Amino acid sequence: MRVTAPRTLLLLLSAALALTETWAGSHSMRYFDTAVSRPGRGEPRFITVGYVDDTQFVRFDSDAASPRMEPRAPWIEQEGPEYWDRETQTSKAQAQTDRENLRIALRYYNQSEAGSHTIQWMYGCDMGPDGRLLRGYSQSAYDGKDYIALNEDLSSWTAADTAAQITQRKWEAAREAEQLRAYLEGTCVEWLRRYLENGRETLQRADTPKTHVTHHPISDHEATLRCWALGFYPAEITLTWQRDGEDQTQDTELVETRPAGDGTFQKWAAVVVPSGEEERYTCHVQHEGLPKPLTLRWEPSSQSTIPIVGIVAGLAVLAVVVIGAVVTAVICRRKSSGGKGGSYSQAASSDSAQGSDVSLTA
């Protein structure tokens, strides 16, 4: 995610794109950094992965035989050697930053060096249909708990505990939010526009969900109706159940959207209903790939078999993504791996798509 062209050229390019291009809906670019200490087994491991919308496109792993930022999507492979060199150097610099931040966190929390600890950082930008910043974010976590986060105004911080308040005071004194805001409003959006253009066929597609409802008897008195959406992209989708037109949100079991392993996603929503009253329930599906929302009912004559194989495959892929990327459950609260008490270092260039000028340093 590093810029390979001179910044002046990039700004001209992004300005041209902003004037001539529009995008359906909003789009996002996010980076997830994770550093894990392992006492007695060498330096902490550092992994960063980059996503445009729901597509992973780059990955760096400090444990690789020859650590480099590597492509994870065909459309990013067109970037030249300078891009990959710059992204690699930014990732290596962040790895060193987070290793130092792990040491600082031990002091802040009065912890022993004998245990393993984790720092996570999630940051990025959302862009609206007009090609401009919709929202920016930077959130960090330590050992799976919120640490510090940039507020929506992009100019202030929220610290989760007294240790994080030390970091907050340092960053406020150094006006770190200003640097981060400049990256989010400028470089981040510029690169997101570029990636959307280069990966147009993949990133700007909308795969229509394949939908159906299945029926699962629980007893003589109750049954589960499960509404399925399969093979859709992008991942954002809404599934809701209604009874006689009234939302059943409180009574609905809803699973997280899952990758299917082929670049699409899966999701289901279930509700327990009294036997014999199934016809009173409707499932409503909203997705970018649909010209209008769908309304589904269970049709007894077309009872479907649950696609267990597909769901199991999706879960397996999800496990690989989570474990392999070591991005754990930090997304759940949008935690990230910022430096505990760190400050942003002025790295070699602000042209990195990762934002080398917002690297958290102790």
Curated annotation (Swiss-Prot):
It is a single-pass type I membrane protein. Residues 299-308 are annotated as: Connecting peptide. Residues 335-362 are annotated as: Disordered. SUPFAM superfamilies: Immunoglobulin, MHC antigen-recognition domain. PROSITE patterns: IG_LIKE, IG_MHC. Residues 115-206 are annotated as: Alpha-2. InterPro entries: Ig-like_dom, Ig-like_dom_sf, Ig-like_fold, Ig/MHC_CS, Ig_C1-set, MHC_class-I_related, MHC_I-like_Ag-recog, MHC_I-like_Ag-recog_sf. Disulfide bonds join C125-C188, C227-C283. Residues 333-362 are cytoplasmic. Residues 207-298 are annotated as: Alpha-3. Glycans are attached at N110. One of its GO terms (biological process) is immune response. The chain crosses the membrane at residues 309-332. Residues 1-24 form the signal peptide. Residues 209-295 form the Ig-like C1-type domain. Residues 25-114 are annotated as: Alpha-1. Residues 25-308 are extracellular. Residues 343-362 have a biased composition (Low complexity). PANTHER family: CLASS I HISTOCOMPATIBILITY ANTIGEN, GOGO-B*0102 ALPHA CHAIN, MHC CLASS I-RELATED. Heterodimer of an alpha chain and a beta chain (beta-2-microglobulin). This is Class I histocompatibility antigen, Gogo-B*0103 alpha chain.
